[in-house]
Amino acid sequence: MTAPTPDPSIPPTAATAVRLGLPGGEAVTHRDVAANGARFHVAELGDGPLVLLLHGFPQFWWTWRHQLTALADAGYRAVAMDLRGVGGSDRTPRGYNPANLALDITGVVRSLGEPDAALVGHDLGGYLAWTAAVMRPKLVRRLVVSSMPHPRRWRSAMLSDFGQTRASSHIWGFQRPFVPERQLVADDGALVGDLIRDWSGPRPPEEEDLAVYRRAMCIPSTAHCSIEPYRWMMRSMARPDGLQFNRRMKRPVRVPTLHLHGSLDPVMRTRSAAGSGEYVEAPYRWRLFDGLGHFPHEEDPVAFSTELVNWLKDPEPDR
């Protein structure tokens, strides 16, 4: 798929850089919904049980373009949202801790008029999906996480595994004031393309697709808002609010869970993600995609979407 080529003479805005079409020309619906005191942009396709898709860093809803079509074709109401501070959603001055971001997600479920949803989260979106399943279990029908361990395993790996600490060096770099924001938008967001390319396996997204993410990062304030959650996640480790969050996440996930990971993921090591099932008291399936990196849903969208749809349709997913 090749993304629409933006006009470099036009400064990026949410309207021009985010409200895009889908690869096959399907009539995706863009709209805004209110939740948890903010406005969120969503892209929607299809009818049926709600599947809410949550992007990671450094992306926005468009990362799920292939899965929106696959899910809609399979009989689901597929909705990809932009997280707080990203894409077409509000850039608020605060509220980027994971507990509040999880309330954004469950609030969007309610604003869409649904009693619950299957949450599908990648990277940071996966971290928040784990969190939402613990905090608001009645609103989460099923849970799918890609490229992200359970928050408690993430914390443990970051503190005790030098290999994981080194793999996540970008997160440590985010702790500096001002500098990361400037780096992300320099040269029309060139670093965004470099990160996605470097974190992918042998089949990274096309350059035209990387240009879409670069342009979206250059929307004013997006770079700052994109890294604020990671600042909280690191700086709060020894603070009372972070310790309270970590204790809260000891409560088990009690919904069927599918955990997907790329064997070549250089950002989140397989050994850090594997074993997250210890926090799930429900059917849990671990699936490792050989030869894929940090973005399996983009690197091999057919394999990822097939695994996702088959599992969602399985009435009794295995442990």
Where on the chain are the PLM-derived regions?
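Flexible "cap/lid" subdomain of the alpha/beta-hydrolase fold that forms the substrate-access gate
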Residues: 2-29, 38-40, 79, 86-120, ...
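Conserved HGGG/HGGXW glycine-rich cap/lid loop of the alpha/beta-hydrolase fold
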Residues: 41-88
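Active-site pre-Tyr helix/loop in NAD(P)-dependent dehydrogenases
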Residues: 57, 149, 295
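A short, glycine- and basic residue-enriched loop/turn
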Residues: 60-61, 127, 292
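Catalytic histidine-centered segment of alpha/beta-hydrolase-like enzymes
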Residues: 292-301, 305
